[in-house]
Amino acid sequence: MARNEIRPAVKLRSTAGTGYTYITRKNRRNDPDRLILSKYDPVIRKHVPFREER
């Protein structure tokens, strides 16, 4: 199978509304739902939840 099918690149957008994004890869078999990760948002200088954007 192609690499892109198993581990697609996804954008994680800040829930703080700053528009800051991270780009990462996820495994669809382990995480079929949207990812929500706590990451650092340098715009507001805090750790906030980042949600997968579709």
Swiss-Prot record:
Keywords: Ribonucleoprotein, Ribosomal protein
GO molecular function: structural constituent of ribosome
GO aspect biological process, one term: translation
Gene Ontology CC terms, in alphabetical order: cytosolic large ribosomal subunit
Lineage: superkingdom: Bacteria
Protein family according to the UniProt entry: Belongs to the bacterial ribosomal protein bL33 family.
Name this protein carries in UniProt: Large ribosomal subunit protein bL33A
Species of the source: Mycobacterium marinum (strain ATCC BAA-535 / M)
Gene expressing this chain: rpmG1
